[in-house]
Amino acid sequence: MRTLLTILAAGSLLAHITEDTSDLLQHVKFQSSNFENILTWDGRPESPPDTVYSVQYKTYGEEEWLEKEGCQRITQKSCNLTMETSNLTELYYARVTATDGAGRSATKMTNRFSSLQHTSIKPPDVTCIPKVRSIQMIVHPTYTPIRAQNGHQLTLENIFQDLLYHLKLRINHTYQMHLEGKQREFEFVGLTPDTEFLGTIMICIPNLFKESTPYMCRVKTLPDRTWTYSFSGAFLFSLGFLVAGLCYLSYRYITKPPPPPSSLNVQHILPFRPLQFIQEHTLIPVFDLSGSGGLAQPVQYSEVKVSNPTEPPGPPPRHSLPEIAYLGQPDLPVLRPSGGPPHQALPVLSYAPQAAPEGRPSSYAPQGALEAKPPSYTPQAVSETQLPSYTPRATPDNWPPSYGMCGEGSGRDSPPVTRSGPKHLGTKGQLQKEVPAGSCSPTGLSLQEVTPLAMEDPQEAKSSHQCLRVHTDSDSDSDTIGQREPGTRSSLKGQLPLLSSVQIEGHPGCLPLQTPSLPCSPTDKGPSPWGLLESLVCPSDEDPVSKTEAESPGLQAPDLESPTELDSLFRGLALTVQWES
């Protein structure tokens, strides 16, 4: 009986001691993340501070415990067993022994541990890059403390072949976008600019049903500044264009020649109106009047326009003035040449227009004749001190209208001109070269042609002027050549005072047209049909030959034997006169 009581007392005492020492160690276990294996434990709160801890480990299937260097009699409550448990295919055990200052000790062992199964995955390392309409996420590789046989440090991708990255993007907790894959770069596109998003990235291991702790990032897309760039580009372009324009204007201002001084502007003080040649025509006579066959040489004339000196330079405006066309009549006049010595060629003359009398009409308008009677113009005699004045009047039916044509001859034979018809002139019908300077037909008009210096041959310096006289059939025997006094100049009288003087370029002087002269015939009692110029004074008429002939007006050429028709000469020609007031 006494022995039984002793055994019960010893067992109760041993149980009490064991219960007291078990409070020295609590929660001994492995904590592994990304294959980093840490052994941790806890002690009781009232344990004395002088308690020390020792760690031992062993592989599953072995009986001997191995001490961990650096984890013997330590006061901290953790020990890193990563290198000792680095084999992913092995199972491990570990135990901890705690000893206090009173000499009491306690030992606890962990459960069986497999790093491949029990390790946890940490959140990945991700960089979020915001853009205007997208967010780019780059996942960095996660390295583990496990090393390969060659010493290279392994990553999670090297250990888990089926590792995936799962990404989520949320907008105000209402809208989500998902991306998943093994690549390390992802981008969410089609986002709203200047908007905040919440991104979540996790590592998933489907075979082990493992997921990492999610990595969360808040990112805001960039504001859309495209319009700002466009506006800036447009502004810079406009600024460059403005600078270029200013540079161009400055260049034009610097290189612009200065305006000429007003003292050089002599347009308002010129005593004449310059003649401007604006159009050039060609007259081609149909038949030769000199008796030889063949077509005549073409004659060129220019249309002359007088510019207003008070107006600025430039083409003066055209007035709506009527155009006068001279057409041939069915009845033809008789051509009566006048003989006389040839004159010398006129030098290049210079003409200046002068003001015409205000009382005279400013335009010439031919008056229509009666239907039964064609018009005929009869010259009237005027005095030297009075300008000629003509009035057209009707003539009897048997008087055909006459044409007057004046040309310039020379000492040589004139160019061949075709005869006007079957009643052509013989030897007497040809134009005589010796025509007095002032001789004209009784009913016609003499116009001495002035040839420019550029068109005149130097060998024609002694050429003379010829006057073709045209008579009607009824007046061919009764009319005579007018007498002129010595010293008077041959003149061309007309009805319309359009030009008072004429100036030709290259001649030093002016040819006035105001000097009145005697009529071509004492029988001039009517207006002249060629009265466009008031008077055309030729200085060359004062040569000795002209003066001698002027003193002897009785010298006349014999009358033509037969009349010559000139209708074919002017057929198809439309002569137009234009003038400006």
From Swiss-Prot:
Q: Which GO terms describe its biological process?
A: cytokine-mediated signaling pathway
| Residue numbers carrying Phosphoserine | S410, S414
**Which stretches face the Extracellular side?**
16-228
Subcellular location(s) per record: Cell membrane
Q: Quick one: signal sequence residues?
A: 1-15
**Annotated region Disordered: where?**
354-493, 539-563
Q: Which residues are glycosylated?
A: N80
Does the entry annotate any disulfide bonds, and if so which pairs?
A: C71-C79, C128-C217
List compositional bias (Polar residues) regions by residue number.
378-389, 440-449
Q: Which Pfam families match?
A: Interfer-bind, Tissue_fac
Q: Where is the Fibronectin type-III domain?
A: 18-115, 141-221
> What Gene Ontology molecular function terms does this protein carry?
cytokine receptor activity
Q: What does this protein do?
A: Component of the receptor for IL20, IL22 and IL24. Component of IL22 receptor formed by IL22RA1 and IL10RB enabling IL22 signaling via JAK/STAT pathways. IL22 also induces activation of MAPK1/MAPK3 and Akt kinases pathways. Component of one of the receptor for IL20 and IL24 formed by IL22RA1 and IL20RB also signaling through STATs activation. Mediates IL24 antiangiogenic activity as well as IL24 inhibitory effect on endothelial cell tube formation and differentiation.
Q: What is this protein called?
A: Interleukin-22 receptor subunit alpha-1
Q: Which organism is it from?
A: Bos taurus
